Amino acid sequence: MPTITLPDGSQRSFDHSVSVAEVAASIGAGLAKATVAGKVDGKLVDASDLITNDASLQIITPKDQEGLEIIRHSCAHLIGHAVKQLYPTAKMVIGPVIDEGFYYDIAYERPFTPDDMAAIEQRMHALIEKDYDVIKKVTPRAEVIDVFTARGEDYKLRLVEDMPDEQAMGLYYHEEYVDMCRGPHVPNTRFLKSFKLTKLSGAYWRGDAKNEQLQRIYGTAWADKKQLAAYIQRIEEAEKRDHRKIGKRLNLFHLQEEAPGMVFWHPNGWTLYQVLEQYMRKVQRENGYLEIKTPQVVDRSLWEKSGHWANYADNMFTTQSENRDYAIKPMNCPCHVQVFNQGLKSYRELPMRLAEFGACHRNEPSGALHGIMRVRGFTQDDAHIFCTEEQMQAESAAFIKLTMDVYRDFGFTEVEMKLSTRPEKRVGSDELWDRAEAALAAALDSAGLAYDLQPGEGAFYGPKIEFSLKDCLGRVWQCGTLQLDFNLPIRLGAEYVSEDNSRKHPVMLHRAILGSFERFVGILIEHYEGAFPAWLAPTQAVIMNITDKQADFAAEVEKTLNESGFRAKSDLRNEKIGFKIREHTLLKVPYLLVIGDREVEMQTVAVRTREGADLGSMPVAQFAEFLAQAVSRRGRPDSE
């Protein structure tokens, strides 16, 4: 009979096979009521599952991350229950958990509307109020097929076909509704009260645009109403910061159907973009990078040699000319190897750091495009470091330091790092992987940085570090990458003459800090809600006159500031000064300079910030010095 060992080391013995729920009840009524599932010897199981042998057990409640994910998964099944009651001819497809929520894909004869979504949510709440138990039945394969055949659930039958080795499957019953899943799921609908459906979208069966289109209902679920309310507030704040809305309001860019996934930069947005590029150019030059420029359209033969044609062709834009196939480059690395290959290099010339603001194009599915965050045409702050094995650690450490400095300049102080190590299928010897992984780990350790280890998540050609920024809303954006590559230099014939006069292949470090410029601008827009630090603001100061009598001096101040290297504009319109101040405050201009008769007489400007602070009157030279200090701080706090 089983003896159950709990996380605190205490043990409970039973004279019969015992369910997770029974163990919880033996500990206390409160825990029994809160039990969502269990973890038996490290494996998640349903609360109703029996434990027949000695085992360790952790009771899973809504306070646990696993409990929250189970609640979300069960909410997806609840969508199915509600949809089948309201729209009996709908066909249910799949309903997985995603980050902070869930969705269900459904085939139906017409598009769902917001009114439909409201009706589905209302029905889900009504079902929850019935407080019914969710029943799990492990069912033989043939019976599963009979169940879904009788219900006309064609997609479920296709999913069963995808699992030929499964002789028994878990069926979960929500009253008359049944769904197929490995589980676990909540034992009762009382756990599902704190949910909300969030949006509708299209999807394709198996994610393939060639297949039939489905409808996707998204939702979120939390452990309690307080967590749900906090999430909704965060989402509302994120919507306020939507880079597409702010981009239009601040006249930064636009997108249009004739060029899907391609950005039309307006003067304000292009100014911001150029500030980023000029900053990165300066940083890279100061850190020993050599800037290059490579072609955008390259013959198929190079992509075949690099392996991209075989593995990436569906994502490449291609064209033909004079019976030759070409691809618009989706990435820069093969072209950078071509630059390295011009003339045999000596070990004395390594490391060689080649950088390019490389324009790339990828044929992303139209449904995946999102503003300037997910586009088809983009530019990367891309660079490749060609070095010896002995130089891997030093180059990695230097890059990590540079990356952290850059992020601080943009105002990001919380950075998450992941170190991904060797997968099962890989090139290169175990000894080489040992050295490469040790080099990246040592580089992170030497910088005093914490990181998450991702075993088996590296590319087949080398381990990597990913850098993810946390913005003001706590959202995480993966931006920087440091990827070691043992494969591409061999495939493309990159060699150098080593110290012993033999020829060796260099190690290639793919690296980016910002990633896509377009996406990084989108992140900045949302992080700052368009109120960029002075060094990034498209217009750093606007000069406004009160009456026409001050127009000449206002124009003179504008000229002085622009000649001093700042981005200043004057607003000489015949409008009330309050109107002008409000307009430029909404346009997020950092500094508003007001000129009246007194300022003309004293040769000063009255300075206000966009936040409404009155900095008083000061000579133009003093303001220029003040602005220069603000610009030099970049995005770092005043204390740094």
Swiss-Prot record:
- What biological-process GO terms show up in the record? threonyl-tRNA aminoacylation
Q: Which SMART domains does the UniProt entry name for this protein?
A: tRNA_SAD
Q: Which residues cross the membrane?
A: none
| GO MF annotation: an example | metal ion binding
Specify which residues bind Zn(2+) according to the UniProt entry for this protein. Answer: C333, H384, H510
Q: Which residues form the TGS domain?
A: 1-61
The Enzyme Commission number assigned here is 6.1.1.3
- The coiled-coil regions, if any, are none
Primary residence? cytoplasm
| Domain of life per record | Bacteria
Q: Name one GO cellular component term.
A: cytosol
Stretch list, region Catalytic: 242-533
One Pfam family per UniProt:
TGS
Q: What does the record say about how the cofactor binds?
A: Binds 1 zinc ion per subunit.
Quote the catalytic activity from the record.
tRNA(Thr) + L-threonine + ATP = L-threonyl-tRNA(Thr) + AMP + diphosphate + H(+)
PROSITE patterns the record matches: AA_TRNA_LIGASE_II, TGS
Its annotated compartments are: Cytoplasm
What are the alphabetically sorted keywords of the record? Aminoacyl-tRNA synthetase, ATP-binding, Cytoplasm, Ligase, Metal-binding, Nucleotide-binding, Protein biosynthesis, RNA-binding, tRNA-binding, Zinc
Question: What are the required cofactors?
Answer: Zn(2+)
Q: Give a short account of what the protein does.
A: Catalyzes the attachment of threonine to tRNA(Thr) in a two-step reaction: L-threonine is first activated by ATP to form Thr-AMP and then transferred to the acceptor end of tRNA(Thr). Also edits incorrectly charged L-seryl-tRNA(Thr).
Q: How does it assemble?
A: Homodimer.
Give the protein family.
Belongs to the class-II aminoacyl-tRNA synthetase family.
Q: Which PANTHER family match?
A: THREONINE--TRNA LIGASE, CHLOROPLASTIC_MITOCHONDRIAL 2, THREONINE-TRNA LIGASE
Q: What is this protein called?
A: Threonine--tRNA ligase
